[in-house]
Amino acid sequence: MRMRNHFLTAVGLAALSVGLALPAIAEVTEQDILNDAKTTDDVVTYGLGPQAQRFSPIKTLNRDNIKGLVPAWSFSFGGEKQRGQESQALVKDGVLYVTGSYSRLYAVDARTGEKKWEYNARLPEGILPCCDVVNRGAALYKDKVYFGTLDAKLVALDQKTGKVVWRKDIDDFKSGYSYTAAPMIVKGKIITGVSGGEFGVVGRVEARDAETGEVVWKRPVIEGHMGELNGKPSTMTGKANESWPGDTWKFGGGATWLGGTYDPELNLIYFGTGNPGPWNSALRPGDNKWSASRLAINPDNGEIVWGFQTTPHDGWDYDGVNEFVPFDMQKDGKTVKAGATADRNGFFYVLDRTNGAFLSATPFVSNINWAKGIDENGRPIYDDANRPGDPAKSEDGKKGKSVYATPGFLGGKNWNPIAYSPDTRLFYVPSNEWGMDIWNEPVNYKKGAAYLGAGFTIKPTFEDHIGSLKAIDPATKKVVWEYKNKAPLWAGVLTTAGNLVFTGTPEGFLKAFDAKTGEEVWKFQVGTGVVASPITWEQDGEQWIGVAAGWGGAVPLWGGEVAKTTAGINQGGSFWAFRLPKALASR
């Protein structure tokens, strides 16, 4: 945590919302949200649809004409505030909404890049973001735009003016809570989680009335905690002490820091849950449910419908928060309502999304050694020789046995979202090849202090690359193609009906690949690392591509030896928009 304090002191400017008036904007409806994966003029959800497949049906741009894709404009986030820019933008009626580091939100003319308005949150001293001062995006609904802030607040703004409509506390930032994800809109409710898993917080998913900001329900994800519905206690999550000893469940982690997906047909929202607290697993024997899990939740009342734990009794910070992407899979001549997730533990899971039944788990990174495999029920077959030792059993009682474990704690895949193409039936997974030395240390919970109980050094697995973009067939469980990158990959992925896959690199490139073969067909240098998720939309009869740029995130803060591969990369803060001119579209 000491690594980050030097830039937190810059926080504390007064909230500011200034800019130009916007023309009339049609309200974003429930139907707009549900149809976002099919429509082309707008992008109104994080993930290009509630299922977050990040697939666009636009096929104007293809490998034959992509050489004509050129920059249209670049918008600077301004000021001295830089750090990581991990936001996915939204577009509605010619206005682009993009969040920036330090809890900022901008409305920009999508044709010209002219700023319409901006909102700068009032961030107090002492905020505790674990992994840089990032924000991953906003949500649109009716006439408002919503986003969360690093001091654990949820803000609703007027889309036209950027003026605050309401501002609500998610939780107490002094206890370690924060918020970095893009909210999700489901049936008139705004769905959020919490960040702060390294500080002994308790993860939860909650729903608020999108008009008023008032809480409708809360669902803690750690066993023993009581849910809430309409202001009253509802049901307990699991059973107290069933998989947590003593009072460890009170500070059990499981932060829901990445946001969720939604299946409207099944009426289920899917959330991943983070690492248990503390990292030192010797202090909490048991499965520690529902940390490091995927949960299906009823959006009407917050009840858990099913849960699947990818790393029970996690001892490596393998988290479990990565997105669960619904898709339909052909198996034995039948269509299976499936969902997939590329877990930080290095396995690519496919589950039945109706009931959480385990279908398959396949390694997607090299040299996994914390587990010997996954059994027929989806449970890891642990290699206990590669679990960090209990410091209480060491000679000095201060440091347990150190082990080398693969993947490293930043994961086979971290936050950066995968994409799925129904055309190729492939998932595109931004992964990293690294391991770590890790050991356990004594720790006690203290409000607002890091609750790790572990030390670590992360190291690259190979000399020639760390980053690896892989195309994975969920039916055959095979890697179809792979692109290797020298530095870690930290950007999200976009795929299109034009047989293209887009992602960014820390070296400053936005790149495009042939979706079937993995051949690199285009790249553009934006001058700083790309760690955001690209989008695409149609405007004036042309296809546009957009991405935020600005190096940062967890790698330079936590990356140890692998951070050396990015040591010379400049920070930045901007949004780049590219277009394929009509005259070049047919070439």
From Swiss-Prot:
Residues 379-399 have a biased composition (Basic and acidic residues). Induction: Not up-regulated in the presence of La(3+). Residues 1-26 form the signal peptide. It is found in: Periplasm. Disulfide bonds join 130-131. One of its GO terms (cellular component) is outer membrane-bounded periplasmic space. Disruption phenotype: Cells lacking this gene are not affected for growth with ethanol, with or without exogenous La(3+), indicating that either XoxF-type MDH (in the presence of La(3+) or MxaFI-type MDH (in the absence of La(3+))) can support growth with ethanol as well. The triple mutant lacking mxaF, xoxF1 and xoxF2 can grow with ethanol only when exogenous La(3+) is added to the growth medium, and additional loss of exaF eliminates this growth. Deletion of exaF alone does not impact growth with methanol, with or without lanthanide, demonstrating that ExaF is not a primary methanol oxidation system. La(3+) binds at residues 198, 275, 317, 319. One of its GO terms (molecular function) is calcium ion binding. Keywords: Disulfide bond, Metal-binding, Oxidoreductase, Periplasm, PQQ, Signal. Its main location: periplasm. Pyrroloquinoline quinone binds at residues 136, 180, 195-197, 257, 344, 490. Its EC number is 1.1.2.-, 1.2.2.-. Binds one lanthanide ion per subunit. Binds 1 PQQ group per subunit. It catalyses: ethanol + 2 Fe(III)-[cytochrome c] = acetaldehyde + 2 Fe(II)-[cytochrome c] + 2 H(+); acetaldehyde + 2 Fe(III)-[cytochrome c] + H2O = 2 Fe(II)-[cytochrome c] + acetate + 3 H(+); 2 Fe(III)-[cytochrome c] + formaldehyde + H2O = 2 Fe(II)-[cytochrome c] + formate + 3 H(+). Belongs to the bacterial PQQ dehydrogenase family. Catalyzes the oxidation of ethanol to acetaldehyde or acetate, but only in the presence of lanthanides (Ln). Contributes to ethanol metabolism when La(3+) is present in the natural environment of the bacterium, allowing bacterial growth with ethanol as carbon and energy source. Exhibits relatively low methanol dehydrogenase activity. Is also capable of in vivo formaldehyde oxidation to formate during methanol growth. This is Lanthanide-dependent ethanol dehydrogenase. It comes from Methylorubrum extorquens (strain ATCC 14718 / DSM 1338 / JCM 2805 / NCIMB 9133 / AM1). The gene is exaF.
